[in-house]
């Protein structure tokens, strides 16, 4: 059986401050750095050997991937970065305190923006300091592809081609794969892998730690699913 390990990035500075992060390139907190190292230790203890790793183009996921691979003595494993594994784009909510947003827009509205499958938050202004339209890491993309806001549905739509073109073929080739990504990009892929309904995915949470493991048969049917260390 092949294994796919999802590691959500460790706690970021904005997680710690309770801010909507999305595509903002925020660093790991001290706690988050340790979580990434501990994730690697759990991987080593479990004896999981990787052949390929994938991550987003955001530093909190990149650092988590590198720290986890280093702690599991697998820093040599090839790592491919893709914007398609980025966190969901929180649009105009980016940088806002979650509690303050609830006060401004109402608890129910913010809950809908955060947890619904297909409701978009307000768009981010193109001149916002966190806008991806002027970010060099997305310079190769057509401007029409770069989002101003995303819901989970849109997040899955842009992550799914990466699953179909990269992750799934690697697994079918018998490779164990590490994916260092984000809460919502992982949720989106979990929805696809498990065939969850739009309502079912609303209750799925992906913690910063520990890593989530899927084991597949040769046809990519899920054989088992578990969190390391639990």
Swiss-Prot record:
Q: What is its EC number?
A: 5.4.2.11
Q: Which residues cross the membrane?
A: none
SMART domains to which the protein is assigned, alphabetical:
PGAM
- Which residues of this protein are catalytic? 9, 87
- Asked if Isomerase is a keyword of the record, the answer is yes
Would the keyword Isomerase be found if you checked this record's keyword annotation?
yes
Q: One GO MF term, please?
A: phosphoglycerate mutase activity
Family membership: Belongs to the phosphoglycerate mutase family. BPG-dependent PGAM subfamily.
Q: How is this protein named in the record?
A: 2,3-bisphosphoglycerate-dependent phosphoglycerate mutase
Species the sequence originates in: Streptococcus pneumoniae (strain CGSP14)
Taxon lineage: Bacteria, Bacillati, Bacillota, Bacilli, Lactobacillales
């Amino acid at each position: 059986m092949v294994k796919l390990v999802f590691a959500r990035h460790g706690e970021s500075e904005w997680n710690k401050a309770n801010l909507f992060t999305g595509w903002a390139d925020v660093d790991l907190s001290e706690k988050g750095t340790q979580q990434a190292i501990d994730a690697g230790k759990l991987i080593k203890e479990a004896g999981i050997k990787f052949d390929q790793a994938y991550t987003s183009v955001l530093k909190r996921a990149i650092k988590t991937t590198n720290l986890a691979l280093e702690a599991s003595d697998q820093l040599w494993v090839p790592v491919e970065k893709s914007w398609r594994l980025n966190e969901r784009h929180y649009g105009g909510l980016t940088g806002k305190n979650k509690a303050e947003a609830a006060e401004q827009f109402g608890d129910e509205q913010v809950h809908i923006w955060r947890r619904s499958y297909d409701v978009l938050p307000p768009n981010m202004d193109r001149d916002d300091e966190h806008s991806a339209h002027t970010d060099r890491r997305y310079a190769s993309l057509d401007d029409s592809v770069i989002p101003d806001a995303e819901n989970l549905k849109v997040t899955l739509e842009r992550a799914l081609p990466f699953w179909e073109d990269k992750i799934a073929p690697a697994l079918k080739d018998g490779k164990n794969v590490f994916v260092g990504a984000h809460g919502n990009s992982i949720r989106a892929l979990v929805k696809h892998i498990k065939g969850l309904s739009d309502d079912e995915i609303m209750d799925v949470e992906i913690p910063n730690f520990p890593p989530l493991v899927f084991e597949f048969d040769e046809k990519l049917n899920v054989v088992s699913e578990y969190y390391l260390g639990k």
